[in-house]
Amino acid sequence: MSITKPETTVLKNYIGGQWVASSGTETLEVPNPATGEVLARVPISTKEDVDQAVQAAKKAFATWKDVPVPKRARIMFSFHHLLNQHHEELAELVVQENGKAYKEAYGEIQRGIECVEFAAGAPTLLMGESLSNIAEEIDSEMFRYPLGVVAGITPFNFPMMVPLWMFPLAIVCGNTFVLKPSERTPILANKLAELFTEAGAPPGVLNVVHGAHEVVNALIDHEDIRAISFVGSQPVAKYVYERTAAQGKRVQALSGAKNHHIVMPDADVETAVQHVISSAFGSAGQRCMACSAVVIVGENETFVRRLKQKADELIIGNGMDPEVLLTPVIRQSHREKVLGYIQKGIEEGAVLLRDGRKEMDDRPEGNFLGPTIFDYVTPDMTIAKEEIFAPVLSLLRANDLDEALSYIRKSRYGNGATIYTKDAKAVRKFREEADAGMLGINVGVPATMAFFPFSGWKDSFYGDLHVNGKDGVNFYTRKKMITSRFDF
């Protein structure tokens, strides 16, 4: 990703209710992954820009924390209404900026809207606890209070949903927020800020600062930032977690994944194939809940044959085409990295059942890669261990469910796993022994709804409190205990 000098209008940061040009002089291109068309330029903001945003958020917090909870919730209801009004427009922006298929983009917006719905329930979510007579004439109460200024660092693969995981809940809890979106998908963040302001959010409650590494470090290190929420790759997630935690700040860092789908001998083949295809190749495999490894228990050549047939039938192209499922990866540089993984799989002895590289020449204008399937992959191979984040699927073989579960246990990641079976005993064993935080039973993408935590395990998550659900409320609030005596 090359740095260029600005030649055209550059996106601005949103600070204190105003669109503000970055003090930095460099920008990055924001190309459409399907066409290469440059949609905008995003500024490489500076430490000074971050400080300006944090100071605006700090100033806003002084009054926002005292805004009655029902009034905060009403702003969320207004925001929810505006997101619904602009649903189609936002989905088209996701397609243009991220590249995914329109149907998936529309679904992403819907998931984000559901997060705002959850945040709108703040009066219930923020209720404290009390107990009378903990001792004679003594009562105890617990109240929730906001932390202050908090920050979110979000990825390119869900440029709408992940910010909506974070800032609505943080803000309705009484905090103010600084959002650093991915420099690959910055346009949508500005649109969110615009709609949130229209919904009635006061200046400084939500701020957006674009940029790269310097912005991340400046947010982590700023003395007025109380918590960091991050979603991204494993090396960066670990870095963000360690650097933030070392300063005694709250941090939740969602990381990489290697999600295994187990196909049992009694599985309905067509159902399993349909779910694996959608999970592995939807969004070009660029999601942390994507199926990237299938473990076939016993002999099931029918499943393998049908999987390849369905992969061959996939329509590849621009996400605005309603027939398209498989869309481009985000950047040419990422595709080059994926090609290296494919070559590594060949060199390490996996059988290349379907070579997605052949589709590249048909679409030279975009970052396309066809569905790629390796068979007879072993757990020690690179493609079986590392997150590739692309439409590349590994098929592993296991003699029984115990062996299949051992593959999941050996993985450094623990985001999700799925089993396809009709056997209740196998389901229970899988539920109890699969070493991952989100499990699917005949479900291809077992991602949770907003009222449950998004609960990755092992190297898929660094921190104590997950995003969403009660964990999210606990992350963005602190508790104050009051003990009262009445025997005077």
From Swiss-Prot:
Q: Which top-level enzyme class is recorded in the Swiss-Prot or TrEMBL entry?
A: oxidoreductase
* Gene3D superfamilies reported for this sequence: Aldehyde Dehydrogenase, Chain A, domain 1, Aldehyde Dehydrogenase, Chain A, domain 2
Cross-referenced Pfam families: Aldedh
Keyword NAD carried by entry: yes
**MF (Gene Ontology):** malonate-semialdehyde dehydrogenase (acetylating) activity; methylmalonate-semialdehyde dehydrogenase (acylating, NAD) activity
Q: Where is the active site?
A: C288 (nucleophile)
| Keyword Acetylation found | no
User: Which Cys residues form disulphide pairs?
Assistant: none
Q: Mind listing the UniProt keywords for this protein, alphabetically?
A: NAD, Oxidoreductase
Name its GO BP terms in alphabetical order: inositol catabolic process; thymine catabolic process; valine catabolic process
| Ranges that cross the membrane | none
Enzyme Commission code: 1.2.1.27
Reaction(s) catalysed (UniProt annotation): 3-oxopropanoate + NAD(+) + CoA + H2O = hydrogencarbonate + acetyl-CoA + NADH + H(+); 2-methyl-3-oxopropanoate + NAD(+) + CoA + H2O = propanoyl-CoA + hydrogencarbonate + NADH + H(+)
Output the superkingdom of the source species: Bacteria
Question: Which residues participate in NAD(+) binding?
Answer: F156, K180, E183, R184, S233, S255, E387
Pathway involvement of the protein, from the record:
Polyol metabolism; myo-inositol degradation into acetyl-CoA; acetyl-CoA from myo-inositol: step 7/7
Instruction: List the InterPro entries.
Output: Ald_DH/histidinol_DH, Ald_DH_C, Ald_DH_CS_CYS, Ald_DH_N, Aldehyde_DH_dom, MeMal-semiAld_DH, MSDH_GmP_bac
Any idea what job this protein has? Catalyzes the oxidation of malonate semialdehyde (MSA) and methylmalonate semialdehyde (MMSA) into acetyl-CoA and propanoyl-CoA, respectively. Is involved in a myo-inositol catabolic pathway. Bicarbonate, and not CO2, is the end-product of the enzymatic reaction.
Family membership: Belongs to the aldehyde dehydrogenase family. IolA subfamily.
Description of how the protein assembles with itself and partners: Homotetramer.
Name of the protein: Malonate-semialdehyde dehydrogenase 1
